[in-house]
Amino acid sequence: QVHCYNSNFPKGMLLRFFVHFYDMEIIEEEAFLAWKEDITQEFPGKGKALFQVNQWLTWLETAEEEESEEEAD
C-alpha cells in the first residue's frame, strides 16, 4: 500500500501484487481480509488502495465462504 502510494498508484499495480501474493501462497486469505477491515491513518493511501482491489477482495471473501460451506457439508 505504501509503495503504491509513493508511486502515485499506477493502475493495477496493487491488484497484481495481491493476486501474485495469493497465487504464490505468500499471504493467506485471512490476512487480505484483515487488511481490508483495518482502517487506520497510520499508512497513507488506504482509500485508493481499497478502490483498486475491492472487487478482488469481494471475490476472495465469497470464495472463502463457499469453501467453508463445502467443508461443513
UniProtKB/Swiss-Prot annotation:
Gene3D superfamilies: 1.25.40.180. Transmembrane segments: none annotated. GO terms for molecular function: translation initiation factor activity. Phosphorylation; hyperphosphorylated during mitosis. Keywords: Initiation factor, Phosphoprotein, Protein biosynthesis, Repressor, Translation regulation. The keyword Phosphoprotein applies. SUPFAM superfamilies: ARM repeat. GO terms for biological process: regulation of translation. It comes from the Eukaryota. Residues 1-70 form the W2 domain. InterPro entries: ARM-type_fold, W2_domain. Belongs to the eukaryotic initiation factor 4G family. Interacts with the serine/threonine protein kinases MKNK1 and MKNK2. Binds EIF4A and EIF3. Appears to play a role in the switch from cap-dependent to IRES-mediated translation during mitosis, apoptosis and viral infection. Cleaved by some caspases and viral proteases. This is Eukaryotic translation initiation factor 4 gamma 2. It comes from Gallus gallus. The gene is EIF4G2.
